[in-house]
Amino acid sequence: MEFFRIQRDIPFMRFAPVLNVISALLFVAAVFFLFTRGLHLSIEFTGGTVMEVHYPHAADLAAVREVPRRLGYGDVQVQAFGNPRDVVIRLPLHAGESSTMQSGRVMAALQAADPQAKLARTEFVGPQVGSELATDGLKALAFVIGGIMLYLALRFEWKFSVAAIVANLHDVIIVLGFFAFFQWEFSLPVLAAVLAVLGYSVNESVVIFDRVRENFRKYRKYTTVQVIDSAITNTISRTIITHGATLAMAFSMFLFGGPALHYFALALIIGISMSIYSSVFVAAAIAMWLRVKREDLLKSGPGRPKNPNDPNAGAVV
């Protein structure tokens, strides 16, 4: 499906040298902030107190969120749970206070603001459990990256595989770098968004590389740069449709999803935008710098008749 077709190929690779330098600087900056500032982990990773409060009416989340903040709990997560009358409050660990003391103080303040509020459940998430979640999250990220690397190694010639893997890491590190620089809260939903970004990034690179391989067979007189420019130009319409729809969904969650989905949607917006950029100016550019050529993708087909009038005779992918 295409919204439009561009008749003349756009010279994307003409801008690759400058944009590759910018990408390298962004990547180095992201790594620097990850090591110096680190990620601002949520209580799911660091531990804390989880309270479930029931109201006989729809709860005012903004008012509920303000109550623990007035008590000195800065990084509080408040969200509706199941229905508008049930609220989940996540409190970070506080020096000198037990989980029971935390929940007691907050509940007393909530009932002072609304006597009908009732504590339905309280739970303590210890630092050890949070550490296990962080470890499991890193394992999930490593498994996804490993699976993508294996798929690319089997699916493409090694130069394309290296280019796609570098583009994947570029996107993930820069997303994490944004969260480290601005100290946005990194939670389990944000980790899920990072894993989704990995999928979007490799998908876009694979689409372009498939078209590059097809164009090598189709245009024998084209140079490598011309083949790559043509492949990217031919896939622009598809990119606009798929990523435009996904970004529209992510922006909807960002604008209307409330605090619970805020950083999840933000990670998706940054990651998907970076995947569009990196598939063109990182993955395709690296394939160009590695000097991918027709001979890397096409090989002689044994026993096949060769037609001298067929420019692709004897070549198979």
Residue ranges of each PLM-predicted region?
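A structural signal for conserved, well-ordered secondary-structure elements
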Residues: M1-V317
